[in-house]
């Protein structure tokens, strides 16, 4: 169970997004965003084995896609946290921003919060308040049919193996960077030891050679 995809948009204009795995998220999300009214509201759409949860506030839509067995309270907890961070960071700038204007910065925030709320099940249950439970009861769940441009029924297609490939690449990259960092650290340490050794030998030998210029040891 996980949050598979998250997006922040103004109407159908996507401002930032992050996907946990491969899939036709954008194609499906564009249709979902087009169906969301501009007034403040919260709703969950059900489509096949997936749920689309969203919060719309001040024309900005915070939306995530989850498996149908993922707890709705955790999904809306994620969306509320994303909304708070986005509003704090960008404020009214989001009302006039160009498509993907916040993606380079905010996609990493989406990734971190997506990971946190997907993995920390016990924490969410402990911190969940009665007010949150009552709020969730008021959020409706509606079935939705999606139609592709060709007129065919549109299905959300997920490729979770892509996440495994990405994780493998990330692991290899991290290992390579770690090895490089350790090599640089060892070179620096060796250089420091050599310099300290030379200085130490110089200090020890100088009195025996008549001073710091070694007059009795250096032949003129």
Curated annotation (Swiss-Prot):
Domain of life: Eukaryota
Record-listed Phosphoserine modification sites: 167-168
Transmembrane segments: 189-209
Presence of keyword Cell inner membrane: no
SMART domains: Longin
Membrane topology: Single-pass type IV membrane protein
Alphabetical list of InterPro entries matching this protein: Longin-like_dom_sf (IPR011012), Longin_dom (IPR010908), Synaptobrevin-like (IPR001388), Synaptobrevin-like_transport (IPR051097), V_SNARE_CC (IPR042855)
GO molecular function: SNAP receptor activity; SNARE binding; syntaxin binding
Residues bearing PTM N-acetylalanine: 2
Ranges per topology, Vesicular: 210-220
Family from the record: Belongs to the synaptobrevin family.
The protein, known as: Vesicle-associated membrane protein 7
Protein's organism: Rattus norvegicus
């Amino acid at each position: 169970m996980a949050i598979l995809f998250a997006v922040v948009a103004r109407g159908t204009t996507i401002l930032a997004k992050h996907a946990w795995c491969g899939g036709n998220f954008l194609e499906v999300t564009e249709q979902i965003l087009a169906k969301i009214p501009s007034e403040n509201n919260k709703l969950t759409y059900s489509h096949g084995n997936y749920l689309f949860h969203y919060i719309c506030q001040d024309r900005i839509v915070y939306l995530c896609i989850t498996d149908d067995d993922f707890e709705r309270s955790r999904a809306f907890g994620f969306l509320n946290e994303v909304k708070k961070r986005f509003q704090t960071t960008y404020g009214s700038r989001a009302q006039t921003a160009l498509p993907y204007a916040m993606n380079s910065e905010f996609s990493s925030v989406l990734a971190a919060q997506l990971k946190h709320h997907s993995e920390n099940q016990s924490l969410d249950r402990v911190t969940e308040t009665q007010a949150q439970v009552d709020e969730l009861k008021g959020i409706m769940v509606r079935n939705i049919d999606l139609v592709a441009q060709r007129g065919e029924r549109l299905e959300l297609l997920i490729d979770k193996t892509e996440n495994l490939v990405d994780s493998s690449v990330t692991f290899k990259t991290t290992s390579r960077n770690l090895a490089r960092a350790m090599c640089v650290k060892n070179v620096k340490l060796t250089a420091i030891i050599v310099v300290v050794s030379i200085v130490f030998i110089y200090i020890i030998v100088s009195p025996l050679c008549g001073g710091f210029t070694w007059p009795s040891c250096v032949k003129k």
